[in-house]
């Protein structure tokens, strides 16, 4: 059970050292380090509300599902003194998995923000999902972080979702530290994991620790920088991991360990010298005769420079479940990952000391309404103050400011740059919005940017880059139990959409039904469950359907004339346009261009009305009414009489577009998923046979320890209920992950089958 964070007994964050060398030989020193408070003490964040920005670390934990992210987070909270008991995913009593569905399923769905202190540092930590249906949660967490910890299962190496998340981190140029978890598993392999990081992530692993023992005999680590041995005594049942012994390596230690450390440290020094010129000069200048004599502090500084430059990734190891190796990981976070002022954000410098923050998540609280997570990039945020939302052009009053501790919060008066906060009272703000102190502040930032670039007045935005929202791939209808509950359902869906932008809700124009669009079966299932649990509405879901797309096969030109009298006004507009298929990439977004003379002739408001008409037509393709992709529209002529409204222009353009799309011939595009299945060799043939019946294309079959890794491309429509089938085929001894690969044209036979199915003929 989570206890109050405001316990009156306050202690410093630094662990204390107890000398245990009384019975040791004089030349040998043994230390026992305790990294937590007494069992009945819980620390309070009120000790330091606004730490120095150099002491802040905004960190994300990311990995494949079941690699141990949440367990690692729980150990961090325990050893730093913010929880009394060790939370366990299997027991359903973790701090960061606070939604009922998360505790039942043992997976992380929403990115829970946790703030805690480690030694002299403030760590704002985000625990992100490892399931592909919740990729947006990872994306929006990474958008506001300065560093990341990638957690790997040491017996599996780099897995499918790890590669997806790693690509997201690379896009945001986030320095990373790798943690090889589950070193206690019999199949755990340090060498395999390092090779996997090199081969699959194209990263440069910088090994900082080697394990002592393997499998069940894994008892400790050796730090290659300091040459110190860390040993945890007993097992997870008898030792919570708070105390462990640190010994300097001695000649009397195991010769195999000494040899392994000597070779690994020499390799580390050589690798860092190759990656960091300053360190290479230091070695050749002062330590040319004996590289191994380089001081640990100099080596650590070089590793930090390599990490911040993203030339290499420090690799540590341990077992979070067995309470081993987490404290050194916390030390590595503070030692190697950047402070907020070490990350470059171009736009932020134009605000100088004024407030600039990004809203990266919204959750709903029944008593307090919407709670908005914000990352403060510059200036400070104060409770009971007004702030301006640049994206919505709205000024709102923020009533309260909170520090997040999973599902608990501490109220604070203000918070400075570099921190992550939770705000109450921002009712219009959604994910990706930029928050500043005032309209005047935003205008001043734009002026500074223009002066620096000596560019035109409209070439700069005062808004930070938002969060990219992926397109949904599944949809289904949702109905309330009675019409009396329709308004309640609409309110629930509005709240859930603000929390989760990857959830789309639309009204079917033909049936009038409410339609949910999501990222996968599990995503839709979780939304359905939340409506029942949190809003007490028993809804009915229709059959799950695939979100297809459409494109065109050839170019076509169409003309249209609209001549209509509304009231006493006559509206006349004529349009001519041509649509072309974008052959090089049928999955590309659509494009709109005007011929030069047309663009020069039309006023800006008419051009906007034309673009709205084209965009409206792109929403419904000519074959099945799915959204259109891979089409370029060229506007060749637009003529209208004075008094013609913008709405009539849009209507005429949309009607003309529909003609052109039909003439061009439609093609259905289906989502194709990249599938990775991990299965024992004894079940491989049955899995392959099943995939061949699902129109799957086998890309590769790899080996990982005793398992086979099957990589395939499979149409999403064929993957409905695959988890149940795979469990049956392999007696539960297989795992799989899916990721959207591309939209591909369906062959004529499959398209006809789909057309008949949609028409209700099959």
Curated annotation (Swiss-Prot):
Q: Does the keyword Zinc-finger apply?
A: no
Q: What is its EC number?
A: 3.6.5.-
Q: What class of enzyme is it?
A: hydrolase
GO process annotations (BP):
mitochondrial translation; ribosome disassembly
**Which reaction(s) does the protein catalyse, per the Swiss-Prot or TrEMBL entry?**
GTP + H2O = GDP + phosphate + H(+)
Entry's Gene Ontology molecular function annotations: GTP binding; GTPase activity
Q: Which residues form a coiled coil?
A: none
Superkingdom field:
Eukaryota
For this UniProt record, give its keywords in alphabetical order, as a comma-separated list.
Answer: GTP-binding, Hydrolase, Mitochondrion, Nucleotide-binding, Protein biosynthesis, Transit peptide
- Tell me the residues of the organelle transit peptide: 1-35
Domain tr-type G span(s) in chain numbering: 54-341
Q: List the disulfide bonds.
A: none
The record's InterPro entries line, in alphabetical order, gives: EFG2, EFG_II, EFG_III, EFG_III/V, EFG_V, EFG_V-like, EFTu-like_2, G_TR_CS
- Relate the protein's function as given in its record: Mitochondrial GTPase that mediates the disassembly of ribosomes from messenger RNA at the termination of mitochondrial protein biosynthesis. Acts in collaboration with mrrf. GTP hydrolysis follows the ribosome disassembly and probably occurs on the ribosome large subunit. Not involved in the GTP-dependent ribosomal translocation step during translation elongation.
Q: What is this protein called?
A: Ribosome-releasing factor 2, mitochondrial
Q: Which organism is it from?
A: Danio rerio (Zebrafish)
Q: What high-level taxonomic lineage is stated for the organism?
A: Eukaryota, Metazoa, Chordata, Craniata, Vertebrata
- As recorded in Swiss-Prot or TrEMBL, the protein's gene is named gfm2
